[in-house]
Swiss-Prot record:
GO terms for molecular function: RNA binding. It comes from the Bacteria. RNA chaperone that binds small regulatory RNA (sRNAs) and mRNAs to facilitate mRNA translational regulation in response to envelope stress, environmental stress and changes in metabolite concentrations. Also binds with high specificity to tRNAs. Belongs to the Hfq family. Pfam families: Hfq (PF17209). GO terms for cellular component: cytosol. One of its GO terms (biological process) is regulation of DNA-templated transcription. Residues 9-68 form the Sm domain. Residues 72-88 have a biased composition (Basic and acidic residues). The lineage of its organism: Bacteria, Pseudomonadati, Pseudomonadota, Gammaproteobacteria, Vibrionales. This is RNA-binding protein Hfq. The keyword RNA-binding applies. Residues 66-88 are annotated as: Disordered. InterPro entries: Hfq (IPR005001), LSM_dom_sf (IPR010920), Sm (IPR047575).
């Protein structure tokens, strides 16, 4: 997994698994609404009355309808430990 996707994938997956409604704003200002059905490295499949495949490069902002918790132990790959802070 690319380092830049270490936050994106768990966030989108939490939205998908919990079926949280989202507003997706595109770079041209258009607002799309629905639930995330699926996603991959390049696209998000958004479900409302119809399914829409939205390319990630066209997305400005993803706004969940409610708070989502996406940093749980189950989101980390096996063997990866949470970052520890050290005081010097």
């Amino acid at each position: 997994m690319a380092k830049g996707q270490s936050l994106q994938d768990p966030f989108l997956n939490a939205l998908r698994c919990e079926r949280i409604p989202v507003s997706i704003y595109l770079v041209n200002g258009i607002k799309l609404q629905g639930q995330i059905e699926s996603f991959d490295q390049f696209v998000i499949l958004l479900k409302n009355t119809v399914n829409q495949m939205v390319y990630k490069h066209a997305i400005s902002t993803v706004v969940p309808a409610r708070a989502v918790s996406h940093h749980t132990a189950s989101d980390r790959p096996q063997g990866e430990r949470p970052q520890e802070t050290t005081e010097e």
